[in-house]
Amino acid sequence: MIPGELFIEDGEIELNAGRKTVTLTVSNTGDRPIQVGSHYHFFETNPALKFDRDKARGMRLDIAAGTAVRFEPGQSRDVQLVELAGKRTIYGFRGDVMGKL
């Protein structure tokens, strides 16, 4: 083995397999770009992002960990969200939940 060498099996990797998802249209109504990270509670994103927040409660972007989606001013785009896993307890972010979902 060589230090840092990876042994990867053939095939596809499916992220978040078996979890509930929802697709929402999101519009940036602000005058600045807004970037949302992979594990940010989407319900609590910047108020300049307009979308059905009730459907986003307990959800995050369905993208690879450590990545983000950027919304330019005036831009609308569809995003897929995936339900949060684990204890489903939310603290921090914008302080809109601060407890169990």
Curated annotation (Swiss-Prot):
Family annotation (Pfam families): Urease_beta
Matching PANTHER family: UREASE
Name used for this protein in its record: Urease subunit beta
Taxonomically, the superkingdom here is Bacteria
Annotated localization = Cytoplasm
Query: What keywords does the record list, in alphabetical order?
Result: Cytoplasm, Hydrolase
Q: Which GO terms describe its molecular function?
A: urease activity
Q: Which reaction(s) are listed as its catalytic activity?
A: urea + 2 H2O + H(+) = hydrogencarbonate + 2 NH4(+)
Q: Does the keyword Transmembrane apply?
A: no
HAMAP family, alphabetized: Urease_beta
The gene is ureB
Per the record, GO CC terms?
urease complex
State its Enzyme Commission number(s): 3.5.1.5
Give the family this protein belongs to, as stated in its UniProt record: Belongs to the urease beta subunit family.
Its EC top class is: hydrolase
Annotated InterPro entries: Urease_beta-like, Urease_betasu_sf, Urease_subunit
Oligomeric state and partners?
A: Heterotrimer of UreA (gamma), UreB (beta) and UreC (alpha) subunits. Three heterotrimers associate to form the active enzyme.
Listed pathway(s): Nitrogen metabolism; urea degradation; CO(2) and NH(3) from urea (urease route): step 1/1
Q: Which GO terms describe its biological process?
A: urea catabolic process
